[in-house]
Amino acid sequence: MIAYTTYLTDARVRREAETIASLPDYRVSVFVLKEHAEANTYILDGVEVVELNVAKYRGKNTMKYLVSYIVFLMHAFLKCTGKYMSNTLDLVHVHNMPNFLVFAAIIPRLFGIKVILDIHDILIETYASKFNGFSNRLFKYGLHVEEWICCKLASRIICTNHLQYQTLVDRGIAVKKLMVLMNLPDPAKFCMNGEKRNPMNQRGFRLVYFGTITKRLGIDLAIRAVNEIRAKIPGLQFYIYGSGEDRDEFLELSRQLNLDAIVHFSEHAVPLEEIISIVKSMDLVIVPNRKNVATEQMLPVKMLEGLALGIPVVVPRLKPIEYYFTGEQVFFFEPENVQSLAMTIAQAYQDKIGRDDKMKNAKKFFEKYAWETHKLDLIGLYRSLSTEKRPPLRKLLP
């Protein structure tokens, strides 16, 4: 697998890698970004994690993002080609962003190795929101070409939800290449295990956001909403876990609003096992996404993870969320409306019975879209691509 991510914090990459590594006839190596100053290689839950000597760029400069991607691509290309040359490669699974990481597998692909492109986020819409639209028509056209070429190069393409699937179909991507593998929490990790939580009145009311700290995902809206209701909810606390390009700006916003004693930021991204333990201790998960072309294609995984852990969620009325959920399962607010978000948090605080009812109803989602079913789909995809015969490298070389 190849992914421009830090392995310990990426639930989807870990879940898929661990699923395949659990099969007796598969060995999985994952090429990812380094977590610290030095790149390490280690084994975790049966997966060989190979950190490449590239750190994640967190900023707003388009060219610096592109350079970081290209440097990672070059490192991944060398590793992937090396595995193929040593006859230890049978299948390549590439996670976007960006899509062009599939070119790390260009040599194996030319010699018949199958390549899976796992589209977490559609690049065109994500970049339009990240960089405030496209001022450069050539850049926008380039992204469309990049998506088309990479999808042509891939043997199969994984989408994370049905709206994303339809968008790619509308753009002319062959239906036979596409499949939906939703970003569902692994019940082996994301479950309450019958744990009893402390009564709310013993520790105040605790809100949590966990994920990328960026303005396009609305964390500033959540901070302002907390400021609106700070006097209405005794013991209100808001915890923000993650990293991102706008963290310093949101820290300053919190200080300006005199929320230092209420809003708390983690120093860095938190490993998956630690974040699970943290979220279990919370009363409400906040998903404050803004409304834009990217979030209208996105089913927030943090919402699903919170629900899987038995924690009610507050979410914006966006197409992908309303496609899968109703007001009987989650607390909805109007997107980009601070007052609506504040009122919804206050409503959730006051309505303990409502919180419990929504959690009971949310179980219907996981009954319909069970990870165990998607897990079998993923394994089936791997087996179908792995069984196709190809000549060994030694017969192809002169």
Identify the function of each model-found stretch.
Residues 327-338, 347-352:
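Conserved acidic donor-binding segment of nucleotide-sugar-dependent glycosyltransferases
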Residues 1-48, 397-398:
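N-terminal subdomain of nucleotide-sugar transferases
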Residues 81, 107-111, 123, 137-157:
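Membrane-proximal helix-turn-helix segments that form the acceptor-binding/catalytic region
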Residues 158, 199-217, 222-226, 239:
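Conserved donor-binding/catalytic core segment of Leloir-type glycosyltransferases
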